Amino acid sequence: MSVSGLPFDDFRTLLRDLPGPDARALVAARERDAQLTKPPGALGRLEEIAFWLAAWTGRTPAVNRPLVAIFAGNHGVTKQGITPFPPTVTQQMVENFAAGGAAINQICVAYDLGLKVFDLALDYPTGDITEEAALSERDCAATMAFGMEAIAGGTDLLCIGEMGIGNTTIAAAINYALYGGSARDWVGPGTGSEGEMLERKIAAVEKAVALHGDHLDDPLEIMRRLGGREIAAMAGAILAARMERIPVLIDGYVATAAAAILKAANPSALDHCLIGHVSGEPGHLRAIEMLGKTPLLALGMRLGEGTGAALAAGIVKAAAACHSGMATFAQAGVSNKH
């Protein structure tokens, strides 16, 4: 516990002193890549992904224990009529994950990925952000700490995803608070909001950011006031992965909002992360650009559940396999360029 005892203090300390990449491992990976049986740069981003893996894991690129972590939370703001689905769907989908019936289950089977689902007090929705803070500082910090446990069982590639009715409204509010513009710039259909419902969603984001406006110069305050339990837990998981130098793939619009909190707190906080895909949610590409990232995939998906990050994990696994498994020119007896 920090000396002052304020719940966020330990996280502020971690964010000030983040570990960096392994320079030696990066050099070794680049040297090996130069000897593989291909022209320099011929594998495009696969080469950069292999270098990224080497730099953060400190070893030859390999993905042996990939894990998808899904964090599920409910939101008080849903009572504003901003989504066509009731909050009970969050719990029902968690049960669907457990039964193996969701899209993410099929992708995990196809790509041999582990899956963990974290139920974040679904019977107790966060505060309605148009009327009050989503969470107290203590509850938000405790949820971040809980999210950090995502890596406890061991992983060498963490895919971050979520489930929560109403959470694209939350993500829009966070992005609006961080980056400005207008609420309309950041609000999209989510699970199918349109017409008057979409207008209510925009109005809710505007009202929430206005209500909390005097406290939005601190990223962690943005998270606790405008966020949700899955936002806090994802931020905690990403931070825990950084402390252990575990590479991270971030999923869609909501997961990117959680990542944005960390980036706002420390500009280097997402150096160990890649964005798995750009979703069909209108604000996602702009949010990714604000992070200075380029997504690996663009498939028009907007499901959440970590599905885009999980699909991207297949690409990361292929990048590692190419780097580690390809023959060198000398091994293959192939002439290198003069």
Curated annotation (Swiss-Prot):
Entry's Gene Ontology molecular function annotations: nicotinate-nucleotide-dimethylbenzimidazole phosphoribosyltransferase activity
InterPro entries: Nict_dMeBzImd_PRibTrfase, Nict_dMeBzImd_PRibTrfase_bact, Nict_dMeBzImd_PRibTrfase_N, Nict_dMeBzImd_PRibTrfase_sf
CDD domains documented for this protein: DMB-PRT_CobT
Catalytic activity of the protein: 5,6-dimethylbenzimidazole + nicotinate beta-D-ribonucleotide = alpha-ribazole 5'-phosphate + nicotinate + H(+)
Active site location: E305
EC number(s) from the headed UniProt entry: 2.4.2.21
This protein's UniProt keywords: Cobalamin biosynthesis, Glycosyltransferase, Transferase
One GO BP: cobalamin biosynthetic process
This protein's pathway: Nucleoside biosynthesis; alpha-ribazole biosynthesis; alpha-ribazole from 5,6-dimethylbenzimidazole: step 1/2
Enzyme class, first EC level, given as a word: transferase
Domain of life: Bacteria
Any matching Pfam family: DBI_PRT
Family: Belongs to the CobT family.
Function: Catalyzes the synthesis of alpha-ribazole-5'-phosphate from nicotinate mononucleotide (NAMN) and 5,6-dimethylbenzimidazole (DMB).
NCBIfam families: cobT_DBIPRT (TIGR03160), PRK00105.1 (NF000996)
Protein's recorded name: Nicotinate-nucleotide--dimethylbenzimidazole phosphoribosyltransferase
Species: Rhizobium johnstonii (strain DSM 114642 / LMG 32736 / 3841)
